[in-house]
Amino acid sequence: MERTFIMLKPDAVKNKHIGDILQRIEKEGFKILGMKFLKLSLEDAKQFYAVHAARPFYNDLCTYMASGPIVACALERDNAVAHWRDVIGATDPKEAKAGTIRALFAESKEANAVHGSDSVANALQEIAFFFKGYELN
């Protein structure tokens, strides 16, 4: 079994898509190991997205991610990282395949409903950012 980290972004929470996305998580065969509803501080967002610090969108991304509540989840299933990336679709919802989470729920390339780890190594780091080991089932 493989683990991945996902986050429902402020737009998905604001637009009341939490239930729909959680249903999709279960339908896709993921086990939810841990889940938290919280609001990131700007400092936390900057630390979480530090890998993008040199990119031109970094400050706007961090400000956006600190703008409202998020839902952080640690998930598990076979091929979890790649499968979740397929389920969420392209970063830009205009390019996302029909039926993917971003095609269904994203507002824009920036407010694109969900985050998903892009590798197993990053998934483990991202899970550790939000969860202590004893918090995971």
UniProtKB/Swiss-Prot annotation:
SUPFAM superfamilies linked: Nucleoside diphosphate kinase, NDK
Name used for this protein in its record: Nucleoside diphosphate kinase
Family the UniProt entry places it in: Belongs to the NDK family.
Domain of life: Bacteria
One cellular component term from this protein's GO annotations in UniProt: cytoplasm
Function in brief: Major role in the synthesis of nucleoside triphosphates other than ATP. The ATP gamma phosphate is transferred to the NDP beta phosphate via a ping-pong mechanism, using a phosphorylated active-site intermediate.
GO molecular function, one term: ATP binding
Organism expressing this protein natively: Leptospira biflexa serovar Patoc (strain Patoc 1 / ATCC 23582 / Paris)
Record keywords: ATP-binding, Cytoplasm, Kinase, Magnesium, Metal-binding, Nucleotide metabolism, Nucleotide-binding, Phosphoprotein, Transferase
A family per Pfam: NDK
PROSITE patterns, A to Z: NDPK (PS00469), NDPK_LIKE (PS51374)
Major subcellular location class: cytoplasm
UniProt subcellular location: Cytoplasm
Top EC category: transferase
Entry-linked Gene3D superfamilies: Nucleoside diphosphate kinase-like domain (3.30.70.141)
GO annotation, biological process: CTP biosynthetic process; GTP biosynthetic process; UTP biosynthetic process
Enzyme Commission code: 2.7.4.6
Cofactor (UniProt): Mg(2+)
Annotated positions binding ATP: K9, F57, R85, T91, R102, N112
Quaternary structure, from the entry: Homotetramer.
Active site: H115
Catalytic activity: a 2'-deoxyribonucleoside 5'-diphosphate + ATP = a 2'-deoxyribonucleoside 5'-triphosphate + ADP; a ribonucleoside 5'-diphosphate + ATP = a ribonucleoside 5'-triphosphate + ADP
Gene: ndk
Record-linked InterPro entries: NDK-like_dom, NDK-like_dom_sf, Nucleoside_diP_kinase, Nucleoside_diP_kinase_AS
NCBIfam families, per database record: PRK00668.1, PRK14542.1
